[in-house]
Amino acid sequence: MPWANRCLTSLRQSIVPCDITIIDNGSTDGTQDYIHNNFPEVDLIRNKENLGFGQANNIGLQKALDNNYEFVYLLNQDAWILEDTFKHLIDASEAHPEYGVLSPIQMKADGLHFEEKFGSYIIPHHQVFSPSLTEDLYFQRIEDVYEVSFVMAAHWLITSKCLAIVGGFSPTFSHYGEDNNYLNRTNYWNYKIGIVPSARAIHDRGDSKWSIEKEMYVNDYVGSLVSFSNPLRRESLDTKIIQLLKRGIRNRQMVLIKYALRLKKERCLADANYERTLKEKAFLK
């Protein structure tokens, strides 16, 4: 709830009007009542349980398709926009319809520095690095949009045409990896992913730090599922499982062995969901 006021007030102040839908994943901290009382214009959908990031978003994405919205903007609860964020993104989208997903420059809460994860994507040697963006930011010769292979889903503008083909988030991923998988599928359906440097927005992660075990979960367990579910260059899950088992035994890290066994158990579901991603409008009606 700490971010709700900042997030929703920023949407009210946008120079491009928008309809707001909030998917509440069974919160019990008073967020639902706060939104109902202070932001009555919001369509608040109350889930009885936490469905996870992807499946909660699918509820909103389905609503957007059913109501023929031209664009959908995914916004984290710990994030907010500037007055002109939507305008810059929509202008770029209309000028470059080959892009299915666009993101603004994502800043820390101070508005002066790149959000830490976002900043790492646009530095040299990172796998999604865009050298032209980095150089142009330095020399102040900015293009409308820069293509990247990944940008985190705290701020995404998705076009209705892209959504109608790519569909929703895969239930293979309950926490982390949903955005990687979605963007791989976006590329599979011949849509590009881009960053619009004229558009700025805030993602306030605070001072949260990842534990070593969380790093392993994201990089090893989730990363294996992302590779196995990538329709562009699918990798063997058996190979990933064997690698995790060997590392776990060699380094005496039981958590890696646990992840390997979990991957083996969930293989059938992940395989079935992969087949669904090869069809249009996957995971939506």
Give residue spans per PLM region.
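Short beta-strand-to-loop acidic/aromatic patch adjacent to the donor-nucleotide binding site
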Residues: 69-80
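Glycine-rich, basic loop-to-helix element that forms the pyrophosphate-binding segment
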Residues: 47-67
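Conserved donor NDP-sugar-binding/catalytic core segment of glycosyltransferases
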Residues: 84-117
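A conserved acidic beta->alpha catalytic loop
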Residues: 24-33, 49, 79
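A short, conserved alpha-helix in the catalytic core of glycosyltransferases
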Residues: 149-158, 162-167, 172-200
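Short, acidic, metal-binding catalytic loop of nucleotide-sugar glycosyltransferases
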Residues: 9-18
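Short, flexible, basic/aromatic active-site loop/helix in glycosyltransferases
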Residues: 122-148
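Non-catalytic, C-terminal membrane-associated alpha-helical segments of glycosyltransferases
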Residues: 214-285
